[in-house]
Regions:
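Catalytic cores and adjacent flexible loops of soluble metabolic enzymes
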Residues: 1-233
Length: 233
């Protein structure tokens, strides 16, 4: 076990309090388990979603424990080779699981040059029947990556948020509440400007008015009877 996890470990009472608070605020409770034993605790909680961390993406015993629960799964793919991703998707699909995968870079924080957001395009193309999201660890003050990810079609997002304490400062990849609000505003802006992408949209009246004022037309200087034939000359 990692020392940091042991130092911040929650007991059953703590978990009950945390999950109840999540539910009381009308949010979904999502949990990441790093060992099989933790799934015994998950079974006792009203959890909505199972998260598979990138470090556990190819951990077959852990994936098997997750798949045995009747819960949707979101799995991060950082560092996984193509064969592993193919196998995990096959594993979950063959068990009729509701699941999504996340483009993710396991570098904390992730420099802009290493974000590789075009991997979202790759994953969406290769696994066209699977929802693809974005789990991000960039500089907490950045709001650019979420906008690009939305423009590329990601529709599930994971962001680390933290509150500093006297004993534990915020790490270098987690946002504080103010930064999180800015991040959400950036996401909302991106969704608004991206608009609709699954059908042709022609309902902009101002656009139609502008085009009409610029388009060529045919006009008659004399009156003609109904049925009069007009030719190109």
């Amino acid at each position: 076990y990692i020392k940091r996890f042991q130092e911040t470990r929650l007991n059953k009472k703590d978990f009950d309090l945390l999950v109840n608070c999540i539910k009381d605020n009308n949010n979904f409770a999502m949990v990441t388990a790093f060992d099989n034993e933790s799934y015994n605790l998950i079974k006792k909680q009203p959890i909505d979603i199972i998260k598979i961390a990138s470090c556990s993406f190819g951990d077959w015993p852990l994936l098997d424990s997750a798949a045995q629960l009747d819960l949707p799964i979101i799995a991060s793919t950082a560092g996984a080779n193509l064969e592993t991703i193919d196998n995990v998707i096959s594993f979950l699909s063959n068990r009729d699981k509701s699941f999504a995968i996340m483009h993710c870079v396991a570098q904390y924080p992730t420099p802009d040059k290493n974000m590789n957001l075009s991997q979202i395009d790759f994953l969406k193309k290769r696994y066209s029947d699977v929802r693809v999201g974005f789990s991000t660890h960039e500089d907490p003050g950045s709001t650019d990556m979420i906008k690009i990810a939305i423009a590329k079609g990601a529709d599930i997002f994971e962001k680390h948020i933290a509150l500093p304490t006297e004993e534990y400062p915020i790490n270098k990849y987690s946002v504080n509440p103010v930064q999180f609000e800015d991040w959400l505003k950036a996401a909302s802006f991106a969704q608004d400007v991206c608009g609709v992408g699954d059908k042709r949209i022609l309902d902009n009246k101002d656009e139609q008015k502008s085009l009409k004022s610029l388009q060529r037309g045919v006009f008659f200087k004399d009156n003609f009877d109904t049925g009069h034939v007009v030719n190109s000359e």
